[in-house]
UniProtKB/Swiss-Prot annotation:
InterPro entries: Ribosomal_uL6-like, Ribosomal_uL6-like_a/b-dom_sf, Ribosomal_uL6_a/b-dom, Ribosomal_uL6_bac-type, Ribosomal_uL6_CS. The gene is rplF. Belongs to the universal ribosomal protein uL6 family. Keywords: Ribonucleoprotein, Ribosomal protein, RNA-binding, rRNA-binding. This protein binds to the 23S rRNA, and is important in its secondary structure. It is located near the subunit interface in the base of the L7/L12 stalk, and near the tRNA binding site of the peptidyltransferase center. GO terms for molecular function: rRNA binding; structural constituent of ribosome. This is Large ribosomal subunit protein uL6. It comes from Hahella chejuensis (strain KCTC 2396). NCBIfam families: L6_bact (TIGR03654).
Amino acid sequence: MSRVAKNPVQIPAGVEVKFDGRLVNIKGGKGALSLSVHPSVEVKQEDGALTFGPKEGSNQARALAGTTRALINNMVLGVTQGFERKLELIGVGYRAQAQGKAINLTLGFSHPVVFEIPEGITAETPTQTEIVIRGIDKQKVGQVAAEIRSIRPPEPYKGKGVRYSGEQVRVKEAKKK
């Protein structure tokens, strides 16, 4: 069995887990998430914890048990604490403004870029060069952050662009005469 799947997921107080066939519904203080479990994975609820295991002994079933455990653990963390991702805008005149369910980005193009924020995600701009994305779904938060970063990724010569907070960009040396 997968080493990840061997560890049970503890269910904290205030989190409700319901099984509806192969669908696992998790409800907490910040919202609710659901996941469809693969037929070859077995999920059991025992005294405040969820345990995972393969129904058959195939390598794929064992791998899927670990994947399912990681996904459900992220769902439990999401409905209790939530997830956040910070982006930094580096470059002269690069700015961001949160306007309702959209972010207005000025990234050196001839026009401002308006990025629509999907449902279940909130974005705020504490400063003009910082964007904070929050939500309960880890995958969605990361996807939105990656889409914003892809509008103007950091370039390798000056490092200008949108980068994750704490990201190290390798800067190349300019061509010498």
